[in-house]
């Protein structure tokens, strides 16, 4: 897939919203105290831990950008699911999503479902989808309570999960990890039985890791 890696545009952050789980916005000292109090009240405090491999993936139903609701349980009936949580202003999300889209174009829809889960409103999410040419389905977490982000214990975005058909999380990836993305692509290849496709082009300089 020969698309150019999109560049982060700091002017495209969109409107300000409550900080969701996984948001690492820089705050003033006063802002940090307010944010931490809010975080404890809404998301269970700083001891939240992202669900790891071997854990059961919480079921969820969320509205999709296309308008129809998405059910994890229903999707798993057809095969494994890749769920990628993101925030539009996160530069690491902006780096990761074009590669996730390559996985989707190579293997998605053939016994593997890939969805993005946005922590932003529909307008800002639509702008992100357009700017970074995201072609897989994108869902909207409730930006007032972030119930699904909370259920998965998000500490950073992007957070990407490979959920096996039995509902068990087999890959739990936080931030950008080349190794994890290659593992997810390998699982998608194995599940679909498709011909192997190039994930990273030889001319691309791919980071091994970037913190979310």
Model-derived features: positions:
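Non-globular targeting/processing and membrane-anchoring segments
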Residues: 22-24, 31-77, 131, 153-156, ...
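Short, glycine-anchored, charge-dense loop/turn motifs used at functional sites
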Residues: 67, 161-170, 174-175
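Short active-site neighborhood of thiol/selenol oxidoreductases, capturing the structured segment around
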Residues: 72-94
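Structural microenvironment flanking redox-active thiols in thiol-disulfide oxidoreductases
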Residues: 94-132, 145-148
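Short, internal strand/loop/helix patches
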Residues: 129-166
């Amino acid at each position: 897939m020969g698309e150019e890696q999109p560049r982060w545009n700091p002017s495209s952050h969109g409107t300000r919203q409550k900080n969701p789980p996984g948001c690492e916005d820089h705050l003033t000292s006063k802002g940090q105290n307010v944010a931490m109090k809010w975080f404890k009240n809404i998301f269970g405090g700083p001891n939240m831990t992202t669900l790891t491999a071997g854990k059961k993936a919480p079921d969820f139903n969320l509205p999709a950008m296309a308008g129809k609701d998405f059910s994890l349980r229903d999707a798993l009936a057809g095969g494994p699911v890749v769920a990628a949580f993101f925030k539009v202003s996160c530069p690491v999300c902006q780096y990761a999503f074009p590669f996730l889209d390559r996985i989707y174009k190579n293997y998605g829809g053939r016994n593997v479902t890939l969805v993005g889960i946005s922590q932003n409103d529909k307008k800002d999410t639509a702008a992100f989808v357009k700017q970074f040419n995201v072609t897989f389905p994108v869902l909207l977490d409730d930006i007032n309570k972030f119930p699904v982000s909370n259920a998965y214990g998000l500490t950073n975005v992007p957070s990407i999960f490979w959920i096996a058909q039995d509902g068990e999380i087999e890959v739990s990836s936080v931030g950008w990890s080349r190794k994890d993305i290659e593992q997810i692509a390998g699982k998608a290849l194995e599940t679909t039985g498709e011909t192997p496709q190039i994930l990273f082009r030889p001319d691309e300089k791919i980071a091994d890791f970037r913190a979310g």
